[in-house]
Amino acid sequence: DKSYCLLKQIILDKNIDTLFCPAYEGGHQDHDVANFISFKLKSYCEVFEFPEYNFHGQVINTNTFIEINGSEVVLDLDKEQRLFKTKSMSVYKSEKQNLKYINLKQECFRPLKHYDYTSPPHDGILFYRRYSLFSWHPRVDDNSPMEICNEIINSKIFDK
């Protein structure tokens, strides 16, 4: 709720007309919550979403939406743009080993679609839960997909 209020104020104060956010895809719970907050800001500016990574179909998918609706813009990156993307990702030193699967050939975005935030982004194992059987694994997060949905549903801005 605090993040929503802060972003809303920044949008209004700075006269921001466009916002980009991660897709609701189960890649990371923070990304999914950011998508929900951005959806609630659609009345203040135009909002676009971009896919990062998901585990739909029990396969790692990058830079592609789980469901295509025809409004997607796909940008094929040239060699210079791919190099820039690689250098940009190297800023995240803590994620160096985690980002090797990212598709460097394209970027994709579309107007933010309306999701059912009361249920996980897709059936099956979400990306951030794929190692959940191994509690000792460093990439395991304790949040269940329904816990994230319940946090969204119980937020003050859910029914706004």
Question: What are the roles of these predicted feature ranges?
Answer:
Residues 1-160:
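Metal-dependent de-N-acetylase/amidase catalytic core
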